[in-house]
């Protein structure tokens, strides 16, 4: 089937596109052209040197006998293609060899001569590997390139979005008002200060929360009561209250070993005033007072010889101790507390030693050398040294640790072997009134200071007070834990031991305790002594019964004198020790009271302090030995005998007076408190007396000073008077008072130690209670807050029925379908999170620059004018704006006298060439060309290019139609911050701007009707008129236009002309807030008119001059916002084109 084609169609088939050639179709086309022009038979002469006629370099030499080849041009031309074909065949063969590796047989066949097929094969294999590697590298490179392109695309999208955000931020920044920024800055500062204060409050609250103690750290009234009134030493049989209640009973038991008898002494010689002993002795006091410890007998005796000074017997001499015989002595009743089980050790014979002097001078030692007793009339031994102490003998078992207290030692007596040649006389046991801490033994420092005591032998005077004390002691009886019902004492293990056996075990002389005497008989003898049964009281019988050799009795004045000296020395030492102990107790009490006062001022501490102000040591006045019940009397002047006998009457000689019954009952009630209220009152009652100790100490010191003064006066008066019948009674009374003072001092020490520990404990408890009260107060405040929140929640709680109904409702599937899935939400949340993180990162990066911008902005804002200064300027601006608005609405009109542009002025300042001085010269006229859509005088000028011109013409018409379709809405205002607003709509006349002449009078030359040359945007001069289709403008508008010259930059290039048109279009935007929002939503074609692709984009800028606003303006918005620079908003400028001629 044949068909026909035109040569054009055949040419299109031969060359369908660039780079593609169909040789057959081209061959057919060329032959058809040759036949059509009749050139098929024509010939072309060739020189033979053409390139396409050159044959291959491989020349096939003819063999011998062959004919020479005939050179044919056509054959030579065909050989060129044959050579190419052979080369292609060779390449195909080599490629086939490369694809399939040669076999072993092929390698053997090829291994001939210099051929190296194996080496070639190895090179081929390496080449393949290299090619494969390059292939992989290229594939990886392409993949990386694709990834980079993908990332670049994502980056481009991000940059586009960022540009939009930046533009939006710029718009927002343009709308920011300086006065609002000031308000926001002030609010921010206030909020910052509030946050700092809130942080401080939170820190303080955290510290307060940290100080809240735990429950176990809180102390209740019951725990405080248990800590104060419960003994912590279980092994001790006595506590504070037992010591308060039992000590008076122990004092009663001590009276059984008091002076058995005193004899009437006749004074026949004068007695000098005695010198009191000014020495302080140290001894060790146990920390606790075991029960029955105050009933020890310390027998002090003396052996009196004719013409010999009174001396101590070996049993009572310094350095010796009284044997604690468990058996009863003749004429005495067993006293509890004597079974101490001390091992008596022999001591070397005592030689002459110097004793403590009674007078300021030195006297011979008042005791003899152990051994044979010197005969009557012997001289006193010479001065010597104190006996060396072999070693310390151990303390009695069961005693606690000891402490050293400055007190008078009644005699550090050494255990000695009793002398069989002498029987101990009846001892004047005034030491039995002293409690157990006065038990003599070696001090810690090894001191051996002794006091010379006088032992009186013979009959005792019948003292009614002593008989009464004995009878009271017999009625009270011995303690049950130490004595059986039949009166036989028990040993430490609780077994009944015969007194005889015990006496032999303890090495007591048979003379003293060797006889077995029935306890009843012994008690009867104690009750009614036979020695005192006679009226005369013959001393001879008493001495005989005692078993001691009858010796000459000393004279009465010596006995009275020495007894008086001994009593005075005892009283002085006791007074000094009592004063020292009282001062130390007062100091400790002051320190404790200070600690208590320094404790946190809680309610309980305040009540305790107020209660403690009632008086110092009021409840313990009688117990501690103060007051008249303990022998303290006011200072009196001893005038006559009647006062002496009245003061020394037996009514003041009571050695043991029970404590105040009200006090004992209060203590018992305090200790037995059970309920919390009772314990609270007990603690307050006890604390009320702690602060009274210092004041009471002062009163005790004053009373003691009065007692010392009275004692000195009495002793002086007794020494001067020398009353024979009252000396013994006075000494006994003084001894009783001294014993009572000593017991009171010991009680003070015990109470001081116990109360000191309790004060420390109470101080710690007070601190803990104070913290607990603070924590409770804080928790109460938190509880109140929580309670208010609970009430608020109860008021705002959700209705249960409504909530249940909402829960019962089924979900709508269509509504659920329209909702996003969780995966999408999570993805969006992740993206938002990343975006927020990026924004925060950018914010942190640009924070410094923002701060600087804020500082500059604040500086600029601070330099703004005041509202009152801007009022005149505002009025002027409104007037100018009215004129400009009219000009913009009616359109620009040519003013020959106006300037040509921004850069060209009416007068140009130049300099003279010859003299170089400034000269003002008028500038020449200059054409100002602005783009206009309807500038063509005819549809197609002769010089215009058809395709390009038509395209531009169509695009201009479309742009003009779009600008007309925008539609300027009436009654629409533009939002320009706080500036004035105008309801009048502005018509955009920017596209009506034409070519203007800078000079000339429009009245003289009618530019509206005259035909002028106009330079078009395509660079071609056209003939046309200035006025538009609407007709000429009124004359008033032209005058206003001449008066107000609108600034316009010179348009030297095409871009400048377009920029000037866009700028004039941006000066008067016709959209109000509503219309602008609608136009923004309608799409980009409303906000950006169509433009030719060769022109740069037209930027829509905010208006430079705000529209008028209603008179009712917001307060604080009087500042005039500055218009941004036009040059900074337009963007970059392309390179300028050469100026138009």
Curated annotation (Swiss-Prot):
Residues 296-339, 416-439, 455-561, 1105-1141 are annotated as: Disordered. InterPro entries: DUF4795 (IPR032013). It comes from the Eukaryota. The keyword Transmembrane helix does not apply. The keyword Coiled coil applies. Residues 468-553, 1124-1141 have a biased composition (Basic and acidic residues). Residues 417-427 have a biased composition (Pro residues). Residues 74-101, 145-176, 757-810 form a coiled coil. Pfam families: DUF4795 (PF16043). Keywords: Coiled coil. PANTHER family: CHROMOSOME 16 OPEN READING FRAME 96 (PTHR47080:SF1). This is Uncharacterized protein C16orf96.
